[in-house]
């Protein structure tokens, strides 16, 4: 089984948000990207178990997105 985990930076709240269409109920946030990955690694098995998914090894693919702006002086 493979699950895609999407990470999006919320500039207004200054946190990373993790969601997944493959893992119902997964919505986590953290100011630290690394800490959020660890939280996701613990939450995914629990959520899949709650959603009656059979026990097996799950491949996690992490996809991050962050938009930023810079000023170009010319």
Describe the role of every protein-language-model region.
Residues 24-35:
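A short, exposed loop/beta-hairpin motif centered on an aromatic-Gly-Thr core
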Residues 8-21:
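Short aromatic-glycine-(Arg/Gly/Cys) micro-motifs in beta-strand/loop hairpins
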Residues 1-6, 34-74:
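Short, charged, surface-exposed hinge/linker loops at domain edges
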Residues 3, 22-24:
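Short amphipathic alpha-helical segments
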Residues 17-19, 29, 39-42:
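Residues within well-formed alpha-helices
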